[in-house]
């Protein structure tokens, strides 16, 4: 923290990089599948409907950002979650979305006439 209690720019940059890695729905889908246990690229491709090359690209980013780990077993590489904390963040976002939708509904109901 800076003297004024603000986050330093270097830390903000690192945080932004992690958020960018999570800003892709396919990556969130992959992480969600990995909650159930480790998977290979082929497993993830079958479960997501994405091509293996595309899954590998997403896994590389998730690995570089520390969201997944990997282990080699024979010819296969198995990926698993490195940090379940990402789902706490997802839960916070979902709660905020519910609140925003509720407020929008209340605003619309406040301006619409009663049913005829």
Language model segments and positions:
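N-terminal helix-turn-helix DNA-binding core of bacterial DNA-binding proteins
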Residues: 10-54, 76-85
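Beta-hairpin "wing" of winged helix-turn-helix
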Residues: 63-73, 80
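Alpha-helical residues within the helix-turn-helix
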Residues: 46, 57, 63-64
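Amphipathic alpha-helical dimerization/coiled-coil segments
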Residues: 1-14, 86-116
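Hydrophobic alpha-helical membrane-insertion segments
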Residues: 32-36, 67, 92
């Amino acid at each position: 923290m800076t003297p004024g209690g603000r986050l330093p720019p270097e830390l903000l940059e690192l945080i932004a990089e992690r958020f960018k890695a999570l800003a892709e729905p396919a990556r969130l889908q992959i992480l969600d599948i990995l909650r159930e246990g480790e998977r290979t690229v082929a497993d993830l491709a079958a479960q997501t409907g994405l091509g293996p090359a595309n899954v590998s690209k997403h896994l590389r980013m998730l690995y570089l950002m520390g969201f997944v780990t990997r282990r080699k077993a024979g010819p296969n590489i198995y990926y698993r979650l490195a940090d379940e904390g990402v789902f706490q963040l997802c839960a916070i976002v979902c709660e905020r979305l519910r609140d925003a939708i509720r407020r929008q509904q209340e605003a619309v109901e406040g301006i619409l006439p009663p049913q005829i």
